[in-house]
Amino acid sequence: MFIYDTKLKQKVPFEPLVEKKANIYVCGPTVYDDAHLGHARSAIAFDLLRRTLELSGYEVMLVRNFTDIDDKIINKALKENKSIQELSSIYIESYTRDLNALNVKKPSIEPKASEYLDAMVRMIETLLEKNFAYRVSNGDIYLDTSKDKDYGSLSVHNSSIEFGRIGLVQEKRLEQDFVLWKSYKGDNDVGFDSPLGKGRPGWHIECSSMVFETLALTDTPYQIDIHAGGADLLFPHHENEACQTRCAFGVELAKYWMHNGFVNINNEKMSKSLGNSFFIKDALKNYDGEILRNYLLGVHYRSVLNFNEEDLLVSKKRLDKIYRLKQRVLGTLGGINPNFKKEILECMQDDLNVSKALSVLESMLASTNEKLDQNPKNKALKGEILANLKFIEELLGIGFKDPSAYFQLGVSESEKQEIENKIEERKRAKAQKDFLKADSIREELLKQKIALMDTPQGTIWEKFF
């Protein structure tokens, strides 16, 4: 297994801290709004990593957090006259629904920052005791980055990073020093009683503490195997996490760092400030979650993905092919083709080379369809094909539906009944040799994007886009 390590800026062999075990921490959302396509892409990227490792024989522990203490949450809760707990719970539920729709496997642990306040306080106390942190006159506590000789080692390769972007805060020793604890400022602020005084943790200390409490190994030079997240988190968030972990515990946070690329909307970086954020829930109104997943995983996780509906519909054709083949082999039993399994897994073991894996899949779909055309009653072949498709379902998380359900996506139960009634009406018209009426019904349904297919077993229908 090879993965791209952001810190080393190259592909390296994955050599876990404990043989055949993989501990992964993925930075989750700050829950003050609905999740957007950037969140979806990150979740799917590292879901693919997890699935690949598991199918390669690793026991995977994946932790993905919820940041439920943050200035953005506090400000929005104040605006909507809600507590931060009420507001964050709304968006945690929304995020969970969205990821379920995208068939992202549930993490081993899903910690909330609010559940680990004591751990954060202990870590800050350690940093103060070791003289890596200092308090300013308003009670805030900062990490003194000048004490960490390796500060910047994770993100320094990115020449666009400028510490000056952070801005000056009165009494900070260096511009890049970052807040560990924000003291309670009175009205409209949120604070928790603690030995540090009333206040709340900074963003970066939240993740480091949750890593330590949920995943960290002891007696190793690294706490976990892989720390992952979006490229936008590399600096300052991941840099600061790495720094405070070194300072507090004398070890590196992660052996490997992985980052997924940005999502652009019509060739422009997606961001709330530009007003072009595309929420997952809005995309799901138009497209099934599996169709979205299939599209989002089709571009290598480190590349920029330029979201547009034309490409999405093109990618759907691949999913259609999977279900067409599945339709032909349902109800058979057999073993997977070992060469197919080996070849496609090796693609994914090469830093999740999904483009190459999909090429292998396309070849399998084409060749097995051709073999079925030549020998449609070959049960052994059908069983092998179904086993191949089952492996794709486990590896890529697509192709898991019943084909009939897939080809009727987006049609309500009442609409289905209306279609069935029309099919019966057409059947009667044909029996009475009223072929003009039968054709008229077919055309009427076509206008509703419903295609009819007459088979020896009767008429079936599908919805098309």
Predicted features, each with a name:
Residues 269-272, 276-465:
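Structural preference for alpha-helix termini/caps and helix-kink/transition segments
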Residues 66-70, 92-95, 105-120, 138-147:
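Short, glycine/charge-rich beta-strand/loop segments that flank catalytic centers
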Residues 78-84, 108-114, 230:
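The substrate-binding groove and active-site-proximal loops of carbohydrate-active enzymes
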Residues 1-32, 47, 118-332:
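Alpha-helical recognition segments enriched in aromatics with Gly/Pro capping
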Residues 8-13, 17-103, 454-461:
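N-terminal, positively charged nucleic-acid-binding surface of large information/translation enzymes
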Residues 58, 132, 450:
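Short phosphate-binding/catalytic loops that engage adenosine nucleotides
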Residues 95, 100-106, 124, 128-133:
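Active-site pocket-lining segments that scaffold enzyme catalytic pockets across diverse folds
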